[in-house]
Amino acid sequence: MPTKIPRTNYAAMFGPTTGDKVRLADTDLIIEVERDHTIYGEEVKFGGGKVIRDGMGQSQVTRAQGAMDTVITNALIVDHTGIYKADVGLRDGRIARIGKAGNPDTQPGVDIIIGPSTEAIAGEGKILTAGGFDSHIHFIAPQQIDDALHSGVTTMLGGGTGPAHGTLATTCTPGSWHIGRMLQALDAFPMNFGISGKGNASQPAALVEMIEGGACAMKLHEDWGTTPGAIDCCLSVADDMDVQVMIHTDTLNESGFVENTVAAIKGRTIHAFHTEGAGGGHAPDIIKICGDANVLPSSTNPTRPFTVNTLEEHLDMLMVCHHLDKSIPEDVAFAESRIRRETIAAEDILHDMGAFSIIASDSQAMGRVGEVIIRTWQTADKMKKQRGALTEETGDNDNMRVRRYIAKYTINPAIAHGIAHEIGSIEVGKRADLCLWNPAFFGVKPEMVLMAGTIVCAQMGDTNASIPTPQPVYSRPMFGAFGRSVERSAVLFVSGAAKSANIGETLGLRKELIAVKGTRGIGKKDLILNDALPHIEVNPETYEVRADGELLTCQPAEVLPMAQRYFLF
């Protein structure tokens, strides 16, 4: 017999449904549920007296007959594909189905079969997102991995060998020997990884050697000499071997200006790191290249968003990261040339327009590895407060803005680096690298993180208590982060050439190797919800930035959400 219940009661039991609105953390960002794939009156929920019981919501279907390994019930999915409610079925470490879960023998419309072999994760009242992808990592310290994972990042790509001075400044792992040692080390952590080799060379042989040795991308960094010759050589090798090239251009304009770099690139695909310039690049106008169709522009998180503290902290940060000396006037001038309030303010707006497409960390080298997700949403909130609703919004909500910003650390870096067939969104067939969030803690502290469908960390209380919720509750590693589960739950991304050469066997790696693909010939048009191509001009004297003739400026934030109130203990 059908019955009606108040929306508040329904949301308390089964989570919000179509038309309901949810605030993200303590921001001004409000999302609205666009659609609901569950069926009213046939929702599944686990617990005493609830639906997922033998003969009710749980069928007799075996795993061999198609029952799921795990079902996440009534989750509010926040993804570039939309903001909607659904059950999510996981099988063999991948997203098998998105829709309606239950027992097809007793319920209508079931496309996710729950059987005796199915585990249940309660998604009602929770937000489900794809795991984050940080594509700008300096592998300085292995402890970064914990900070990233517990913030909701499940894939890290970058370079380095530890706290060597080359790594403190540049995201490059130089040479196949170092690449091999790093892949062997990263085999042990519950995280997906990719290694970027050093791309600074004017002849191709050494670059080919690194790509065949396991690098899945190449990095051009000014501290190693990002000359027009090195740029051209690296891109030529990348085009031949299908890996991405990331670039940190010449701040001092020694080997040329931004126009010379653009000429050396010759319209080829390139991922431009910290395209605003505070993290490094042609001063003062590297930001112009975010309007080029072949450039995939990203930010690093210290300038996200522009606040009253941004400029002051950057000078000391830069001196340390690039091995500079405050007693040398030229070093101080170098540092000061990179830090410009006008371009940092413009960067906020260019992100909101969708002209900057990716956000990453620059871990321990002018970036905070555990704050990619927080700072993305702080930027979105600041822009909502300062610019109001986006013109693209179709309702009284921030769905379009939220979809645009989540794409910046999920699908877009995955597209840029040739791994979007594996990660970056909640879509059938992709790896079940997922984050479950309490809406009040969205973007700050994930409730649970899964790698290939296995829980690797979660909020957990006192483990000597009689129940799992007593204080202190904090994020702790779970079973998926231990033993041989690690090698089954995470992968290493390598070049196609390295996989064909069986480097996994040569190096004794136990994680699966996945070849990157489709990194060349793509452009800004391929970056989802972040494909704007404004014509950018920078005044060389005042550093004012204009997009299609319009001055881009905004005030620095004095207070941010998702900050101190979440980190009192």
Swiss-Prot record:
Q: Which residues form a coiled coil?
A: none
Name the positions where Ni(2+) 2 binds. 219, 248, 274
Q: How is it modified after translation?
A: Carboxylation allows a single lysine to coordinate two nickel ions.
Which compartment or compartments is the protein found in? Cytoplasm
Q: Which InterPro entries match?
A: Amidohydro-rel, Metal-dep_hydrolase_composite, Metal_Hydrolase, Urease_alpha_N_dom, Urease_alpha_subunit, Urease_AS, Urease_asu, Urease_asu_c
Where is the Urease domain positioned along the sequence? 131-569
- CDD domains assigned to the protein according to its UniProt record, in alphabetical order: Urease_alpha
Q: How does it assemble?
A: Heterotrimer of UreA (gamma), UreB (beta) and UreC (alpha) subunits. Three heterotrimers associate to form the active enzyme.
**PANTHER family the UniProt entry points to:** UREASE
This protein is called what?
A: Urease subunit alpha
Native species:
Roseobacter denitrificans (strain ATCC 33942 / OCh 114) (Erythrobacter sp. (strain OCh 114))
Classification lineage: Bacteria, Pseudomonadati, Pseudomonadota, Alphaproteobacteria, Rhodobacterales
